[in-house]
Amino acid sequence: MVYALESAVKEPFIYIRRDIPVEYVEKLRALGAKVVVENWEWNQLEPKPQVDLTDCDIILTLGIRDDLSILSHAPHVKWVHSFSVGIEAMLKSKFQHSDVIVTNSKGCTAIPIAEHTIAMILTFARGIPSMIYNKPSRIWGLIPTIELSSSTLAVIGYGEIGIAIAKRAKALGMNVIGCKRNPHKLTGGEDCADKIVGMDKIDEVLAEADFTVLALPSTNETKYFFDKTRMEKMKKGSYLINVGRGNTIVEADLITVLKNEHLAGASLDVFEVEPLPPEHCFWEMDNVIVSPHNAYYSPDHMKHNMQLFIDNFELYLKNKPLKNIVDKQLGY
C-alpha cells in the first residue's frame, strides 16, 4: 500500500468534528488549510454538516463513534484522522475497502492510561477500598495487602499502551508478561517485559498472573474474547483491569466470577454500554472500581492530539507517509 498522498494543488479543506481551541485552527490556517469546525457533542445525535463538503480533503473526528456516513456529503476525502485510538465505528465494509487513509491518536494516551493502570494495581495491592469502606464505621483492623515485587502482571494487548504499563510495573519490581498477536514483531518494548508471548499462550499466562490488564482494541477477534471460560483460567484471587474496550469482556460472566470470588476484584474503565446505566450492578459491587472511560484523560490531552495532527498535516503537504496509519482490515 502506498501511504503518501498526492500533493495538494488547492487549499486543503479540513473539516473538524470536535471543539478545538482556536490556536490550533490558526496553526492549521497558517499552514495553508481551509478549516471548518462543527462540533459534535458526545451526548448529541450526529449533526448534519452545515457547510458544503464536496471539496473536503481531510476529516478530523472520533473513530470510536463516527461511522463516516458523512462521506456521502464528502466524496473526495483522502484522509480521516481519529481523535480516539479506537476506530471501531468506522469499520464498515464499504469504507474498509476504500482508498481513504485513516490515522489515529495512538501514543497520545499511553502515559495517562498507564498511570491510571498502576494506580488501580496499587489500589488493590494496598487494600485502599477497604480503608475507604472502613472509615465511616471507624473500623480499625489489619487490612490484607500484596507485595508487588513478588507479583506477576499479565498485559494482554502489548502495544504502545501495554508497553507503557509494563515499563511502570517493572519499576515497581513486578514480573511482567506481555501477550500480543505477533510476539516476534519488534516494537521497542521488549526490555519492559520479562517475557512476551503470543495469544495462543494466554491461558497459561492468566493462570500465573496476580493482576491481568486488558489493553485490547475492539475488533472482530477481540469481541467477547474474555468470557467465563477464559476468566476461570485466571489465577484464583487475582485482579482484572480493563483499559482497552468494553466489548472485549462478557460482563455477565465477569459478574459471576466476581460474586463467586474466583476473582478478588476488577477495575473497569470501559464498558459495553457507555455511560454505564445507573441500574447496572457494577455500581453496587464492593470489589469493582468503576471509572467513566477516563483513563486516557490528562490536562495535556488536547495538546498531544492536536500536535500529532498538525505534524501529520505537514507530512501530508509534503507528500510524505503519515504517522499512525491504521490497517482498516485489522482495525488498529
Give short role names for the model-derived ranges.
Residues M1-I101, D227-T229:
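An N-terminal-biased, well-structured beta-alpha scaffold segment characteristic
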Residues V2, Y24, T103-H116, S130, ...:
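C-terminal helix-to-coil terminal segments
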Residues E11, K34, T152, M174-N175:
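Residues at the starts of beta-strands that form the adenosine-phosphate
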Residues N39, F83, I101-C108, D200, ...:
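Short beta->alpha connector loops at strand-helix junctions that form conserved
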Residues D57-I58, W79, F211, Y239, ...:
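Short, Asp-centered acidic motifs that coordinate Mg2+ and/or phosphate
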Residues H97-T152, A164, A171, L186:
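Phosphate-binding beta-alpha-beta segment of Rossmann-like dinucleotide-binding domains, i.e.
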Residues Y158-G159:
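Glycine-rich Rossmann-fold phosphate-binding loop(s) that bind the pyrophosphate
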Residues P183-C281, Y297:
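Rossmann-like adenosine-cofactor binding region
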